[in-house]
């Protein structure tokens, strides 16, 4: 079970959107994805809760958009040493977004592994109204990748919105 630093609002009418997506995205792709995410979120803003692990790449782009549009960020930390597994370049943004989170839930894993990442992804999907998948449609490069999260969400009947604009590329 996850431990919680704060509890989400019960009975809230806010739209809960989880995110899963690729990391290490080229700058041009980040711009395309950011534009698309902001356009989609504007339908709900500011009444939106973005649920994310704050991984580098798509997760942080999504969380920034939620914050900038006046929504709330809820963070799920997959493992005690999760931050250390992120790219060095992502630490600053991770720390800033983490500090602004409305709630933080920590899973009981020590090491940041594929299993802890998938457990976190399952948790965010289970509690979401919808999943935004920043995904090129290709198979996961390892267990717990975006394709696995999309398959899990679809199996549960959670609506999935794939975000991969024309011109987007993986790093």
Show which residues each predicted segment covers.
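Acidic/glycine-enriched connector segments
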Residues: 8-170
